[in-house]
A protein has these predicted regions:
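A structured phosphate/pyrophosphate-recognition subdomain
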Residues: 2-25, 35-41, 123-268, 274-278, ...
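Active-site cofactor/cluster-binding pocket
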Residues: 69-129
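Anionic-ligand anchoring segments at beta-strand to alpha-helix junctions in alpha/beta enzyme folds, i.e.
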Residues: 18-78, 82-84, 236
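Glycine-rich, small/acidic residue-mixed loop/short-helix segments
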Residues: 302
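Short, hinge-like loop/turn segments at secondary-structure boundaries
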Residues: 64-68, 108, 131-134, 287
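Cofactor-binding loop segments of dinucleotide-utilizing enzymes, especially the Rossmann-like FAD-
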Residues: 22, 52, 93, 118, ...
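Primary mode marks residue(s) on the alpha4-beta5-alpha5 output face of response regulator receiver
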Residues: 281-284
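Short, glycine/polar-rich helix-capping loops at beta-to-alpha or helix-loop-helix junctions
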Residues: 54-58, 118-123, 290-295
């Protein structure tokens, strides 16, 4: 994988460019792809954003999100564009396997493939150009860097600002996670100077749910959370019945994993949702507990040092027991 700065001089020549992200995209994935979209179209490129799956409805406020193709719904149209694309940008994931049904198509394409991502252990052999930086707060911050370092800061408009700010806010936990370095605040300051209304974006992300989601949250915290004080760990589980009862949609469980971290002494949180095909895990930690290694070792996943995800084909009951056994095996790291 060659350094991404080699692309800077090639930006001015119009091309056909596809941009994609990981499945079930969050604010950083959707924000970074749409932010890059609004940058590239200013050069006259033909640009198409493709999501491997559907996304949370609370992301529908983002400028031009209505132009994003859901691969599961528009496979033929998406494939046609991908097969004729000159460039493919892959944002907020570093292995094609994170794109579900889209993965085989991405792997077989012969176009120039470009990675912009901040997760650990990238598959660098799959990309022509790229930048991978685990020290960055978000992929949105990296897209901002890409634009500025390419010499085109003047092309950052309000659409780009809103998209990139959304991803930074989400991935830094509203600027409270350890990934919030000085560079993040410098970026936000520059976006504010361009006219960004940060409260508008924050409200769109966090004050945009339905009543059922708040009642669901109350149910989960009251009835589905177990605190294991001797291991400084909390686990939350969501059953299929819970999802049906409260009519939970894509994105409605976002952020719930963070709530137990407010309990004094908690160093690790495990959050599992019982889906039809598998059990989906999310992990959050404080201090020196490595969620990425934990997720890879026990649940075939990965991510960041203090935030990662995984999956399990076992039943909900069995996967919870597996988690409890895993934390016992790592108890010295949780003291």
């Amino acid at each position: 994988m060659r350094p991404i700065h080699e692309l800077y001089t090639k930006l001015s020549e119009p091309r056909k460019i596809a941009i994609t992200m990981h499945q079930k995209p969050d604010a950083d994935a959707m924000g970074s792809t749409l932010g890059l979209y609004h940058f590239l179209v200013q050069f006259g490129h033909e640009v198409q954003v493709i999501s491997p799956t559907n996304w949370a409805r609370w992301l529908d406020w983002m400028p031009n999100v209505n132009k994003v193709l859901d691969y599961e719904l528009h496979k033929t149209k998406a494939d046609e564009f991908l097969e004729s694309a000159d460039w493919l940008f892959c944002l907020d994931f570093n292995h094609f396997g994170r794109t579900k049904l889209l993965a085989p198509k991405l792997a077989e394409l012969n176009c120039t493939k470009i990675l912009i991502d901040h997760h650990q252990e990238p598959d660098v052999q799959s990309f022509t150009f790229g930048v991978s930086s685990t020290g960055k707060s978000s992929t949105c911050e990296m897209v901002f860097d890409f634009i500025v370092q390419s010499g085109h800061r003047d092309k950052i408009n309000i659409f780009i600002s809103e998209c990139l700010y959304a991803g930074v806010v989400a991935d830094t936990g509203s600027f409270r996670f350890s990934s919030t370095h000085a560079s993040v605040h410098h970026m936000v300051a520059s976006l504010k100077e361009l006219g960004l209304q940060h409260t508008k974006v924050h409200e769109a992300l966090y004050d945009n749910f339905l009543e059922n989601r708040l009642r669901f949250l109350g149910h989960v915290l009251s009835n589905r959370m177990e605190v294991i004080y001797e291991l400084n760990t909390a686990v939350i589980y969501i059953t299929k019945a819970d999802l049906l009862k409260y009519n939970i949609k894509t994105g409605d469980t976002e952020g719930i994993v963070n709530y137990p971290q407010s309990i004094q002494g908690i160093k690790l949180v495990g959050f599992v949702v019982d889906r039809d095909e598998e059990r989906k895990w999310s992990f959050r930690s404080k201090g020196n507990f490595d969620c990425n290694t934990f997720a890879r070792k026990y649940f075939g996943g990965g991510g960041h040092f203090n935030a990662a995800g995984g999956q399990d084909k076992e039943s909900l009951e069995k996967t919870i027991q597996k988690f409890k056994q895993a934390i016992r095996e790592n108890k010295e790291l949780l003291q």
